[in-house]
Amino acid sequence: MSRLDGKTILITGASSGIGKSTAFEIAKVAKVKLILAARRFSTVEEIAKELESKYEVSVLPLKLDVSDLKSIPGVIESLPKEFADIDVLINNAGLALGTDKVIDLNIDDAVTMITTNVLGMMAMTRAVLPIFYSKNKGDILNVGSIAGRESYVGGSVYCSTKSALAQFTSALRKETIDTRIRIMEVDPGLVETEFSVVRFHGDKQKADNVYKNSEPLTPEDIAEVILFALTRRENVVIADTLVFPSHQGGANHVYRKQA
């Protein structure tokens, strides 16, 4: 029996990468209701079918763009009754666009990153938090990044968004200490996902170079850490976790084997 059994878990950015892997890791060990939210509805529909065919879970695929801030309250309020009583929110949706230095910054890309990574995460939290306060318990797990702790050239906006996530998470934790609401953050280092393809606007060669001759983490590695955090006893909060592959020591400190 898992401590997650019977819970309703909402994951944003669930169509690929860490979000998708987290859904599978949870489904393997717990009888839960999963709400898989993403912009690519057809993709989360297929994931939902696969999960329900393999595991004892109920899955609701949900079309959601967290950058559409005004739509979020309505989406949460209109959830089907059997999925409305959310117990866990995993704020995973996020992206990086470009590696421009500030002098060359694409402001449209900056607005997209800030809206998605920061305001979207805040809006999701704001929409779900009343459910948790009403029962004095619930889990919010925000997926951050090493970039929120250590900046690098070409990452000014993305690093800023993840720093903002960290401070928001910390403040929320302080605001909820008189409850059983747990506020957690998991910060991955180098993870091989679609993240870099998106960052380089679909240029797969540039994306592949990010991981070239290195041994990055997989989405499953981070999903396992998320599952661990969520399955601790209710009095235990895995507040802030940094996860590196064994050959990484910092944002720009990655050992690469000689070709």
Swiss-Prot record:
Function: NADP-dependent dehydrogenase with broad substrate specificity acting on 3-hydroxy acids. Catalyzes the NADP-dependent oxidation of L-allo-threonine to L-2-amino-3-keto-butyrate, which is spontaneously decarboxylated into aminoacetone. Also acts on D-threonine, L-serine, D-serine, D-3-hydroxyisobutyrate, L-3-hydroxyisobutyrate, D-glycerate and L-glycerate.
Family: Belongs to the short-chain dehydrogenases/reductases (SDR) family.
Keyword entries, A-Z: Cytoplasm, NADP, Nucleus, Oxidoreductase, Phosphoprotein
Enzyme Commission number(s): 1.1.1.381
Phosphothreonine sites (modified residues): 43
Cellular location(s): Cytoplasm; Nucleus
InterPro entries (UniProt xref): NAD(P)-bd_dom_sf, Sc_DH/Rdtase_CS, SDR_fam
GO cellular component terms, semicolon-separated: cytosol; nucleus
Residues of the active site: 158, 162
Catalytic activity: L-allo-threonine + NADP(+) = aminoacetone + CO2 + NADPH
PTM sites of type Phosphoserine: 42
Gene3D superfamilies for the chain: NAD(P)-binding Rossmann-like Domain (3.40.50.720)
GO-annotated molecular function: oxidoreductase activity
Source organism superkingdom: Eukaryota
Binding-site list for NADP(+): 11, 65, 92, 126, 158, 162, 191
The protein's name in its UniProt record: NADP-dependent 3-hydroxy acid dehydrogenase
Quaternary structure note: Homotetramer.
Location (main, coarse): cytoplasm
